[in-house]
């Protein structure tokens, strides 16, 4: 904000600029807490998305910190663009060190909030989805950032032959190819499960589902890997579902995994059984308590965008068009259902929760 004075028929700057402490832009895609710091990735991750400027920021102690943006394109690149930040992660060993994934621009690295470098298809193993295009460097898909327990940074590169890319703790890169997810159109989120399994959301189309990888803690030895993609959902009552969209995944404090789809909420009670031929999902049943002895599946048919678990193991569930639910730890009680009609939320579409 600037102040101007009219002088000799012209407006002349007289004061400013005034810069209130605030988010850099009214943009977000994913939010999550890192200790007392709320990390915000401002973008979008979907086909046909608007080109939102790459936005990364965090809120801590009542103050906003906006990360520095790239001042100019790398030498030799025409119209090099940084758009649509999808995930922002903090180095678990250095709170001043961050990485941000971008829907079509690769991977950004920051130190102390300052832009340090961009990883793209010419200086890293990240791949362009249009390698023969004149602006191939503007089509480097990257999302789903997550650190594992060994300080390796995992990411997802949709619409490429090798979806899973890893920047190891020593700076070396690894690419993990699995036929089940090769060229999947939209892979969006990782879950580093406490058991050591890696679970991933493949959102849509023919390769949608939950992909599970057991790499036995040996990134450099592929021979001992187990992996599977499950699209169809069969519950404990042998009821079958084929969701068009898988949106989110979260581990609760008991190690159970909750999965959000366009057809509702599903549970993986023990992820270590995910590879078994006899594996079934479960749906929480809520007794009607009307003397009929019947029960209904929890949030059946409700499109689930996001899930987070609080310190009491309760489930906060954001939906596509039905507001926000707070569910008890055991799933048997709907504690609250917030909508625009009865709460301060501005929309019944909940994109992310932290």
Predicted regions and their residues:
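Residue-level detector of Asp-centered blade-edge/turn motifs that repeat once per structural unit
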Residues: 33-36, 90-95, 147-150, 192-195, ...
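Beta-propeller blade signature
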Residues: 52-62, 164-171, 210-217
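Surface-exposed loop and turn segments in beta-propeller and other repeat-based domains
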Residues: 10-24, 63-83, 115-138, 174-183, ...
